[in-house]
């Protein structure tokens, strides 16, 4: 399918002075695509040139349109010497290749230079004409949509979820080529950016081809990563979930389910049932076949004789029993046959999605993870990267075997990551073992099930907590009790997952961010010796991180972790571990016991006294946390019943079934009694420090909550004011007398101080919740630690809370107990904010007002020289002309915008930037350099979205931030990779007030320690 690419250079503005004599510039533009280059005329002596060039036309194959970026270079003309480069713009053409997306790219793009940053802007028009032919899609994958969001995109429904797709491409890193010794830093950086852009396009095209082979049309949960392997080369890899998506033809009835967080799906099934079975007769059969096909088709070779048979039978039995009663024997037989064939087609039953509709998950087994330490070698043939493929295949096989051991046939919330230091690379993969509902997958879209009403009678909301494995043959030791909700099935005492909290999960109280942090020193060594040391340390680090998470979960009085993400980062002389998750109290699981400290025996009297004092403090902390997070209602009746918490909760929530099961449950629960206390044995200094770290964990200040999932469990009255921010901090360690204890303290202080600074800067948004808190840890130099965090602050309001219908009966009572602890005060923001309009995830109709400009400007210090502030004004004048009411492109890591409805997805934004400086001190040191660079990244992302006609970026993530510094030479370099989905949204408040109501301008930037707000 060849195509014609047409480019027009319109004008430039705010160009830098290149001629010192006249304080002006003689600018012209080179437009390059593939091997063809066009030039505009030179516009003499102007900082705001008006080229108005003719249309430059490139006749290229559609394969090149996907692989190659459009390169626009702005130069200053010199008569007697080489032309000076002002900067470049890379434009991805792929969004124009979708049938439903933008037809033209038109807007002002920041002109970016890797040494000087943003140097003015250029107005560009880009169009693509595609010609259909008989070989359509043979070499290209035009038309395949990519989404970063880890749930089915709003305004779409899933016809079929096909499954896991992965690909990687490798090449030599220009930074380590011999020519790099003689070329300028600018040329080296630009060569690197150009190569990464090419590899990214090639990777997307190859993944798209795999999707087309599976008869899909989209990739959801697309995660692309860059592995900078130094002299070994450069690897770009990606994973995702292939789907067949259908655009909702009449989005009006689906408004509640299209524009809200995961809790929105509570009402989605009933809305979608208004037009049932519109697609169940045709695509439904392959859907059940394809989706449930993810029961593992292959096993580890050492288990093939037994595991293959067992697991291939499991889905057939489940599907047959689930469908026979209603669909008849013939359909059941057909279903079995289709499932069996699908099982043979799929190798890895993985899903990169983290958010699902109700009843999609039948059971959740727990977190499965695998790590491997590898030695990097030079990539001899970039076209055949078998070595890297084999490495990841080993990891995925191990994940699959772990899921099987838990009695599960699929892995959801799956992700992969690497950590590289010199020749050593740690490969990591994790996910949540799960059993999926084939009936749901066959006859429903993944954003709302058509036959959910009939399905919900069999699987109760607590069903996903029930164990999927055999109680008599458990894969690991666990304390099992009967489910506190249904009293019929067994549940574990705690549940760890990598997914978001299911929308219908019974939760008591609010959630909170729980982090485990760990550092370990190691000896400096090379090659195999280094890899051996790291391999021996990894299991102990994972065990300690798990123990920390368990202790902190008990200290909060909670029993479930969601959104768990564990990072292991390797440096020359240390290993860092950071685990982040959102703790919740699941009412289906038993009440967690306390933490009991056991001292050494025999011991001195003063030591015993110290132990008892610490025990008292721990008990007080647990009680305080239960009050803070409103986890106290079930404990009221505990003493009167004589059995643990499940009995009174059953009496409160399920009166009709309490009489049937109370005797049996009491008998079973009494066997556990109050022995649930988690014993911490203090037998050395490390154990004592672990206990102290528990007690010194600082809770958020009054008015703040935090979580790393999209929405905080237990809060349903959001106000449509969001504030996204990114922050990067680097600390240098004193190498003298560095021990594990001091290293741990420094790392803990770094993370805690980072959170405290965010609370301080956002203090005027109280009551406020930090959602989607995403930490990334790196060891850029031998004696430094870098932590980057991206999150979004959302306000919530007490006044409307009483009017919002609560989806769970446990919440109304605790909400009235202590308003100060619930932090639901009237919003105190500037006049830019709207009135008391709120948005409830349960109700699902969000509203949007102005950005909280005044609030954040009071809470943060503004950097007047930041290009982001200028970009706000620039975007108002150009770029987003199709949406006159838009003043600034919103950015959020969430998959939705509170108070708004996403009407169109315009394509994926995947950008890689390099910034280098030889005057670090003059630019404000590390903080000023990082802050300015992050602001420039924000400005460039906004410009590309506005040029597509969009007004927001959702599912935004800063996937990489690699900082390197040479303080002696006053030099620094930073690499940032960001991605997200460009969208068009309509504000609910704008629809009600009419199109003439403008939105308030957004905030600009925060300026301390490399922080940025957007």
From Swiss-Prot:
Q: Which residues form the C2 domain?
A: 1-109
InterPro entries referenced in this protein's UniProt entry, alphabetically: C2_C2CD5 (IPR037785), C2_dom (IPR000008), C2_domain_sf (IPR035892), C2CD5 (IPR038983), C2CD5_YbjQ-like_dom (IPR056430), C2CD5_YbjQ-rel_dom (IPR056431)
Under Gene Ontology molecular function, one entry of this record is: calcium ion binding
Please note every region of biased composition (Polar residues). Answer: 275-292, 830-840
Coiled-coil stretches are none
Top-rank taxon: Eukaryota
Report the locations given in the UniProt record: Cytoplasmic vesicle membrane; Cytoplasm, Cell cortex; Cell membrane; Cell projection, Ruffle
Which UniProt keywords are given for this protein, alphabetically ordered?
A: Calcium, Cell membrane, Cell projection, Cytoplasm, Cytoplasmic vesicle, Lipid-binding, Membrane, Metal-binding, Protein transport, Transport
Binding-site list for Ca(2+) 1? 19, 26, 76, 78
Bias regions of kind Low complexity — which residues? 293-318, 993-1006
State the free-text cofactor note. Binds 3 Ca(2+) ions per C2 domain.
Q: Give residues annotated as binding Ca(2+) 2.
A: 19, 76, 78, 84
Alphabetical list of Pfam families matching this protein? C2, YbjQ_2, YbjQ_3
A GO term (biological process) for this protein? positive regulation of D-glucose transmembrane transport
Keyword Cell membrane attributed: yes
Q: Which SMART domains match?
A: C2
Q: Among its keywords, does the record have Cytoplasm?
A: yes
Q: Name one GO cellular component term.
A: cell cortex
Its cofactor is: Ca(2+)
Q: What does this protein do?
A: May be required for insulin-stimulated glucose transport and glucose transporter SLC2A4/GLUT4 translocation from intracellular glucose storage vesicle (GSV) to the plasma membrane (PM) in adipocytes. May bind phospholipid membranes in a calcium-dependent manner.
- PANTHER family tied to this protein: C2 DOMAIN-CONTAINING PROTEIN 5 (PTHR37412:SF2)
What does the record's free text say on domains? The C2 domain binds to calcium and membrane lipids.
Name of the protein described by the UniProt record: C2 domain-containing protein 5
Q: Origin organism of this chain?
A: Xenopus tropicalis
Q: Please name the taxonomic classification of the source.
A: Eukaryota, Metazoa, Chordata, Craniata, Vertebrata
**Gene symbol of the encoding locus:** c2cd5
């Amino acid at each position: 399918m060849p195509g014609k690419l047409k480019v027009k250079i319109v004008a430039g503005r705010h160009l830098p002075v290149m001629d010192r004599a006249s304080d002006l510039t003689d600018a012209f533009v080179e437009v390059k695509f593939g091997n063809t280059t066009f030039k505009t005329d030179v516009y003499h002596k102007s900082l705001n040139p008006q080229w108005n060039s003719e249309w430059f036309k490139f006749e290229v194959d559609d394969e090149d349109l996907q692989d190659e970026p459009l390169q626009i270079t702005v130069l200053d003309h010199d008569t007697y010497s080489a032309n000076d480069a002002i900067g470049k713009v890379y434009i991805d053409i792929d969004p124009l290749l979708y049938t439903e997306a933008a037809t033209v790219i038109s807007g002002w793009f920041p002109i970016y230079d890797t040494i000087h940053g943003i140097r003015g802007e250029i107005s560009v028009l880009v169009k693509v004409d595609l010609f259909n032919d008989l070989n359509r899609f043979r070499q290209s994958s035009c038309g395949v949509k990519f989404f970063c969001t880890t749930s089915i995109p709003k305004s779409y429904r899933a016809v079929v979820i096909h499954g896991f797709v992965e690909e990687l491409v490798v090449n030599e890193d220009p930074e380590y080529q011999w020519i790099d010794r003689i070329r300028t830093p600018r040329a080296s950086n630009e060569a690197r950016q150009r190569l990464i852009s090419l590899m990214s396009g090639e990777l997307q095209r190859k993944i798209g081809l795999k999707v087309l082979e599976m008869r899909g049309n989209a990739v959801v949960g697309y995660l692309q990563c860059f592995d900078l392997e130094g002299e070994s080369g450069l690897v770009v890899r990606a994973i995702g979930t292939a789907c067949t998506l259908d655009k909702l033809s009449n989005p009006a009835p689906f408004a509640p389910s299209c524009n809200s967080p995961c809790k929105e799906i509570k009402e989605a099934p009933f809305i979608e049932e208004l037009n049932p079975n519109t697609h169940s007769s045709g695509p439904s059969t392959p859907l059940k076949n394809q989706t449930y096909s993810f029961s593992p088709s292959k096993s580890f070779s050492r288990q093939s004789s037994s595991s293959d048979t067992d697991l291939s039978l499991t889905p057939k039995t489940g599907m047959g029993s689930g469908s026979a009663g209603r669909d008849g024997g013939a359909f059941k037989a057909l279903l079995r046959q289709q499932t069996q064939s699908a099982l043979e087609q799929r190798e890895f039953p993985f899903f990169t999605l983290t958010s699902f509709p109700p009843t999609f998950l039948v059971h959740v087994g727990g977190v499965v993870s695998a790590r491997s330490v590898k030695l990097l070698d030079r990539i001899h043939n970039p076209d055949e990267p078998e070595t890297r493929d084999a490495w990841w295949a080993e990891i995925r096989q191990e994940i699959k075997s772990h899921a099987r051991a838990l009695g599960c046939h699929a892995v959801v919330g799956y992700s992969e990551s690497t950590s590289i230091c010199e020749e050593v690379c740690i490969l990591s993969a994790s996910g949540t073992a799960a059993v999926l509902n084939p009936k749901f997958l066959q006859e429903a879209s993944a954003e709302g099930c058509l036959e959910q009403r009939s399905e919900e009678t069999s699987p109760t909301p607590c069903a996903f907590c029930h164990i999927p494995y055999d109680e008599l043959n458990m894969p690991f030791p666990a304390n099992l009790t009967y489910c506190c909700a249904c009293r019929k099935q067994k549940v574990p005492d705690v549940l760890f997952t990598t997914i978001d909290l299911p929308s219908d999960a019974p939760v008591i109280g609010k959630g909170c961010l729980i982090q485990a942090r760990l550092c370990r020193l190691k000896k400096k060594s090379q090659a195999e010796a280094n890899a051996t040391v790291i391999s021996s340390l990894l299991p102990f680090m994972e065990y300690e991180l798990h123990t920390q998470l368990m202790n902190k979960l008990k200290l909060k009085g909670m029993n479930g972790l969601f959104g768990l993400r564990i990072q292991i980062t390797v440096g020359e002389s240390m290993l860092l571990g950071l685990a982040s998750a959102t703790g919740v109290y699941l009412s289906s699981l038993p009440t967690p016991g306390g933490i009991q400290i056991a001292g050494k025996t025999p011991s001195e009297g003063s030591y015993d006294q110290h132990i008892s004092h610490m025990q008292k403090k721990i008990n007080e902390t647990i009680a305080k946390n239960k009050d803070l997070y409103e986890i106290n209602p079930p404990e009221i009746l505990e003493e009167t019943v004589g059995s643990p918490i499940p009995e009174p909760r059953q009496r409160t929530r399920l009166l009709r079934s309490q009489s049937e099961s109370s005797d049996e449950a009491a008998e079973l629960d009494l066997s556990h009694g109050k022995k649930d206390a988690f014993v911490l044995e203090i037998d050395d200094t490390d154990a004592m420090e672990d206990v102290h770290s528990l007690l010194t964990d600082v809770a958020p200040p009054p008015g703040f909550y935090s979580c790393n999932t999209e929405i905080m469990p237990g809060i349903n009255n959001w106000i449509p004011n969001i504030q996204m921010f990114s922050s990067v901090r680097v600390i240098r360690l004193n190498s003298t007398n560095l021990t594990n204890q001091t290293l741990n303290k420094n790392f803990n202080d770094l993370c805690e101080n980072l959170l405290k600074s965010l609370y301080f800067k956002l203090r005027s948004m109280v009551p406020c919740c930090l959602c989607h808190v995403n930490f990334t840890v790196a060891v850029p130099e031998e004696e430094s630690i870098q932590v980057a965090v991206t999150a979004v602050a959302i306000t919530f309001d007490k006044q409307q809370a009483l009017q919002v219908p609560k989806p769970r009966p446990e919440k109304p009572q605790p909400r009235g107990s202590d308003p100060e602890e619930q932090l639901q005060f009237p919003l105190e923001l500037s006049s830019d904010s709207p009135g008391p309009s709120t948005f409830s995830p349960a109700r699902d109709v969000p509203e949007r007002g102005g950005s909280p400009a005044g609030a954040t400007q009071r809470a943060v210090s503004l950097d007047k020289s930041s290009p982001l502030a200028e970009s706000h004004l620039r975007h108002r004048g150009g770029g987003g002309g199709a949406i006159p009411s838009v003043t600034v492109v919103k950015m959020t890591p969430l998959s939705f915008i509170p108070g708004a409805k996403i009407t169109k997805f315009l394509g994926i934004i995947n950008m890689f930037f390099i910034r280098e400086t030889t005057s670090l001190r003059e630019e404000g040191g590390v903080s000023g350099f990082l802050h300015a660079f992050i602001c420039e990244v924000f400005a460039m992302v906004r410009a590309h979205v506005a040029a597509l006609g969009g007004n927001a970026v959702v599912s935004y993530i800063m996937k990489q931030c690699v900082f390197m510094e040479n303080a002696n030479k006053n030099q620094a370099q930073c690499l940032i990779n960001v991605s997200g989905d460009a969208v068009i949204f309509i504000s609910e408040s704008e629809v009600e007030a009419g199109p003439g109501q403008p939105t308030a301008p957004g905030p600009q930037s925060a300026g301390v320690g490399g922080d940025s707000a957007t």
